[in-house]
């Protein structure tokens, strides 16, 4: 697993745990770093902070593209994988779209339900197709 793949997994861990606990993800990240339990890859912090900074817009897009699925009805893993994927698609200029989608698919395939990969791929694919109008 590449360093960036590990960073994505760790960012997902932070976002997922914070989502389930109802706590601020950046505060959880900062606390983990202060306690020496934080990520060793700076990209993890970049991902978590980026998702939190743009979460309102990301969630708006996810609500719009997830026809018939409210965010709170999605499995928490799927919701947070999608947040990571959308952040990389829209805000990480150094990450090719295909890599962002592929990495999101790898996470959701390993960690969520059998139906989740198709769901996540469909949403991220729609966002990629409409990306020029979303910027």
Swiss-Prot record:
<dbReference type="GO" id="GO:0005829">
    <property type="term" value="C:cytosol"/>
</dbReference>
<comment type="function">
    <text>Involved in transcription antitermination. Required for transcription of ribosomal RNA (rRNA) genes. Binds specifically to the boxA antiterminator sequence of the ribosomal RNA (rrn) operons.</text>
</comment>
<dbReference type="InterPro" id="IPR035926">
    <property type="entry name" value="NusB-like_sf"/>
</dbReference>
<dbReference type="GO" id="GO:0003723">
    <property type="term" value="F:RNA binding"/>
</dbReference>
<keyword id="KW-0889">Transcription antitermination</keyword>
<dbReference type="InterPro" id="IPR011605">
    <property type="entry name" value="NusB_fam"/>
</dbReference>
<keyword id="KW-0804">Transcription</keyword>
<keyword id="KW-0694">RNA-binding</keyword>
<protein>
    <recommendedName>
        <fullName>Transcription antitermination protein NusB</fullName>
    </recommendedName>
</protein>
<dbReference type="InterPro" id="IPR006027">
    <property type="entry name" value="NusB_RsmB_TIM44"/>
</dbReference>
<dbReference type="GO" id="GO:0031564">
    <property type="term" value="P:transcription antitermination"/>
</dbReference>
<keyword id="KW-0805">Transcription regulation</keyword>
<dbReference type="Pfam" id="PF01029">
    <property type="entry name" value="NusB"/>
</dbReference>
<comment type="similarity">
    <text>Belongs to the NusB family.</text>
</comment>
<dbReference type="GO" id="GO:0006353">
    <property type="term" value="P:DNA-templated transcription termination"/>
</dbReference>
């Amino acid at each position: 697993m590449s360093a960036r793949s590990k960073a994505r997994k760790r960012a997902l861990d932070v976002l997922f745990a914070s989502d389930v606990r109802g706590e601020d993800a950046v505060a959880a990240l900062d606390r983990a770093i202060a306690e020496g339990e934080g990520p060793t890859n700076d990209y993890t912090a970049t991902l978590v902070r980026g998702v939190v900074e743009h979460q309102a817009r990301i969630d708006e897009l996810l609500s719009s593209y997830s026809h018939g699925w409210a965010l709170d009805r999605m499995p928490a893993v799927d919701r947070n994988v999608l947040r990571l994927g959308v952040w990389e698609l829209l805000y990480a200029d150094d990450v090719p779209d295909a890599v962002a989608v592929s990495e999101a698919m790898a996470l959701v395939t390993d960690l969520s339900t059998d139906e989740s990969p198709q769901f996540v791929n469909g949403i991220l694919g729609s966002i990629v197709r409409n990306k020029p109008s979303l910027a």
